[in-house]
Amino acid sequence: VAFFLRKNKEELKVARVYNFSAGPAVLPEEVLKEAADEMLDYRGTGMSVMEMSHRSKAYDTIIKEAEADLRELMNIPNNYKVLFLQGGASQQFAMIPMNLMKNGVADYIVTGQWAKKAYQEACMYGKANKIASSEDQTFSYIPDCSDLPISEDADYVYICENNTIYGTKFKTLPNTKGKTLVADVSSCFLSEPVDVTKYGVIYGGVQKNIGPAGVVIVIIREDLITDDVLAGTPTMLKYKTHADNDSLYNTPPAYGIYICGKVFKWLRKMGGLEKM
């Protein structure tokens, strides 16, 4: 019996499943092994990252290293903030209009279920215009976005850059005619090099490409972070709250950010986004 159990344990060690789920999805085995090695004692602290205070020096190093590595991977300019938040990508459907709808108007390009949900949410906070859509053919294509009817007073133009359900992706970013581009990149985050300067906001839940569920990363240009938000916006849903506190206004999804940081280091070790 002992031999049988030992043999099966050995088999389990190599019986990794290739999980092609849209998310949560597979993580690098090297990252999981490192996390396992540090589970009970993170670098001599005598505790797991799950147990340590997010105000501690050890955790401050973890979150700062994670941001620094992400900035290097994506070549994020200094005039952009990196926020590690909670609530998933779906919470951004509300945070974006709450924080960015200065004129109460935004344009949406609806190319799948996630863009549709974001559009529907934005309608609750102002005038959301559907300026292009592929819903007429079950979201099976990306509409021509070279000459869109951009609203003159639009605060931003919104897209979901990659659509896992329908297998479509923006090969070329839409011509926003000078308006701020906001993009949900949850399912293509860190899959290829990106020119961050073409966006005002890039965000995504990490569970598809980067780490465990529970973290959303928001990369936002600093001029978009203001106190001028919709009346009644809760403190926790203001980008400025989190930007002013380096993502530590409240207890963050600490362990998830720790794993994300390990994935960033793994990606750098693999050669960066150019090798992806």
Regions found by a protein language model. Name each.
Residues 1-13:
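Short, Lys/Arg-enriched N-terminal segments with co-localized hydrophobic residues
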Residues 90-157:
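PLP-dependent aminotransferase-like
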Residues 182, 196-207, 216:
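Conserved active-site segment immediately N-terminal to the catalytic lysine
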